[in-house]
Amino acid sequence: MSKNKGQVSLAGAAQAANEEKKRISPWKWIGVGVGLVALLVTGILLFDVVDTEEKPALTAREMAEYTYTADDIAGDVAYYLLGVTGENIGDPMDMLAVMCHDRKAGSVSVVQIPVATYIDKNNGFAVDTIGDIWYNPQPEIFCSACRVRVPAEERDGKVHATCGADLEERTGSAWLDLVRVINTQYGLPIDNYLILPRAGLAELIEALGGVEVELAKKVTLAGESYSAGVHTLMGDAAVEYAVTYNYKNTPASDRERMSRQRQVLAALWQKIAACKMEDLYYLDQYGATKGILGKLMTGANPLRFNTTSFGKARLLNISEEAAADMKLSDAISRFAVQMGQVPLDRVTFSILPGAAEKNGTVSVYSVNREQVIALLNEQMNAYGLYIDEDTVTAPQLNQDPKEADLSTVTLDTVLPVTEEPEEGEE
């Protein structure tokens, strides 16, 4: 397949990793506000464009810097970061994945990422593993005068070399750091992120009437005993099965629990697909938000995502103008309906290739870069992204890694098999 230079728009967060690659256009996006408008009006150059003829036409974004799908193919494909956070502040994430929605083909591909995946904090992060980022974002160095994050090459000690103003340290953005890992270490754009607290996942499953899974053996979940076989698990039991049951906080046990997570996610997908929009979200006669997702989004454990006009537009493949006044519950419910229209046999799951390795005395999950490149090109690259040894830079601790399992499954094969009663049986 021929590759088009304009297919990935690079924002400031990914610029450092790609600044010498002229086949992709690096863009610096600075937070939208009055200052940006003034700078644009006065014609100050804010963007370092390498290839002006083939770059996509981009409008000002209402968001922090990161890499998203280029506008010219955004109607065909979108990439999302999915995750579930741990139970307590400071805990590693329970679940993490990248999802590619090929709108044109009507299919979805999900690559599950072990939470112990090694990222190396020397690459500009505060921690060594991706699952620890959520509660440990890298502090940001900010120039209040220019109203911009300042990269290392623009700092002169504690002063912004560009304007001479003093720099200040601010709390970083966890979601931005997560996205930056995917941008800079795996060469993928991210159009939005969807991060749900563990308690929120339990509430969602409960509201949908539970999820049906097949248990391989007798287990105790949420204080209740279940025999081997097919059972409907309600919120707390389903979440325990998906994230903590038999999990030993090791890379090996993380891969094992990913198979259980697929079971729960397949059943959850099936339940949401059976819902109508009015089941998920509506306003009552008093204007109060109701519905399954309406209740979740207005409760104590809502789904977190980029709620700007651009973020909502990228979820739904609509214009920013159409997304501007859309309520968050409405946007998420519309997104859920869209995803529910993708048949389960068109939803493919795989695991990021790698193996357990030692980083000092700590066991982490180290990728097999060659296999990562092969998997991402096969599963997530129908529109000519550059996914190669130059863009997939994730640290690999073992330079002679073992071959990982590259098998994929579709969600329809994960659901329990229920026998149809023979004719005449009740």
Model-derived regions, located:
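C-terminal solvent-exposed extensions
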Residues: 84, 89-94, 105, 109, ...
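Extracytoplasmic
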Residues: 75-77, 91-96, 105-113, 188-191, ...
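Flexible, polar/acidic helix-loop-strand segments at domain edges
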Residues: 200-304, 409, 414-419, 423-426
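Second-shell loop/turn segments in exported
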Residues: 86, 160-172, 186-192, 246-256, ...
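Extracytoplasmic/secreted envelope proteins and their assembly/folding machinery
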Residues: 93-96, 175-183, 198-202, 206, ...
